[in-house]
Amino acid sequence: MEDVEIQHLTHGPAIAFRDDMTIHGDADHTDMRCAELDEMTSQLLCTTSISRCLKAARSISSRIRCSRRVVALALGLTHSVQTALPQLRSIPIAGTKPFPESITSTSDGALFIGRVGDGGIVRIKPRTAERTVFVKPGEFGSRSIMGVFADEAANTLWACSNNMRALGGPATGHDTSSALKGFDLKTGVGKRSISLPGPHAFCNDITMDSKGSVYVTDSANPTVLVLSPRATGFEEFASSRQFSPPRAGGAGLDGIAFGSDGNLYVTTYVVGELFRLDIERGSAARVTKLHGPPLAFPDALRPFGRNSFLLVEGSGTLDRVDIEGDEFKIASIRSGFREPTSVARVDSTAWVSEGQLSFFFDRAHKRGSPALPFRIYAVPLSKGQTR
């Protein structure tokens, strides 16, 4: 058990930016508005530029109201605000550049974590801190691993594989396309590989319905795809302009999960929105944008009881999202993480992965180096947070 460590989280935003922020300044630059700041967030993780922009914004004349997600990114991901949180148990992830992304769990409490930086999937048993390279980098043609999802009924670990070598991802693996990979959940042996349609697809996250169909978000296109149990390829399940990636670049669709109402819910990463896909007779009948507090780079979305989800925001928080009709409410469970990317629930614990992906995308190394070792954190869920 010596590898299980207790850590103080001493990074990330010190407050939850649930309300709009106000920036004051002098009288020389009245033409700069928060829309310009917001536009700068439409590139995937451009925190350095946003920091410069926020400094410039402090010289603007009148009071300028900026959405929380702009300020949270600049302050949270650049670690310019420090806070000390209560101690959390953590487990380190070996390596200098694993950049852990998605995390999923099985009924025995085992965790499976996809690695963007060096590829492969690691399995961790939190009770003993036993860590195993479950899928080796490059195995079964795989490249950078994004979303992972454990399908125990079919003995399959599904994983999103993307060729990110140009960004510093693994050189191992022969696939050049974005693909959904299926590995044996007991042995890690590759079973299935299904390419996403189109030349510029990006498999991000995964969920399943009760009939065994697999759904994935395509972050490069405004499309949710579905793979039926007996199908050999994907079909389009839903498409909407509202899912479109920003014109300036960056991720569109990201998190995906079924709610207790039987409908499908998705997030958009850069724009920061939450949608419900109303399902009728197995098809997406309507796409509804839900209204609520601003979201700062919403990533993984996981079911969490009746009409609720767990959600991680890239600005540093683990939230509970409660759906009420066409609106949602946010309750922050824990803040202060370094660019969290995913969450998996095991009984009364939420395991949060810190991806620190801004360092992965910073090819010029202007931001320095990520905090090592990479970690996953155990966040206790109180009775009041579950329902």
Please annotate each region the language model reported.
Residues E5, T10-A16, T22-I23, A27-A35, ...:
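Short linear motifs in low-complexity or flexible loops
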Residues Q87-I93, E130-G138, V189-L196, E235-R247, ...:
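A short beta-strand motif characteristic of beta-propeller blades
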Residues A94-D108, V116, E139-T156, C160-N163, ...:
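Beta-rich, blade/repeat-based domains predominating
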Residues T96, F112-G117, D151, L157-D175, ...:
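Conserved beta-strand positions in repeat-built beta-propeller and related beta-rich domains
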Residues G119-V122, A166-L167, L180, P222-L225, ...:
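Structural signal for beta-propeller blades
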Residues K125-A129, D184-V189, S228-T232, D278-S283, ...:
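Short loop/turn segments that connect beta-strands within beta-propeller blades
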Residues A171-K211:
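Asp-box/WD-like beta-propeller blade repeats and closely related beta-sheet repeat scaffolds
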Residues D175-L185, G368-K383:
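Beta-propeller blade signature
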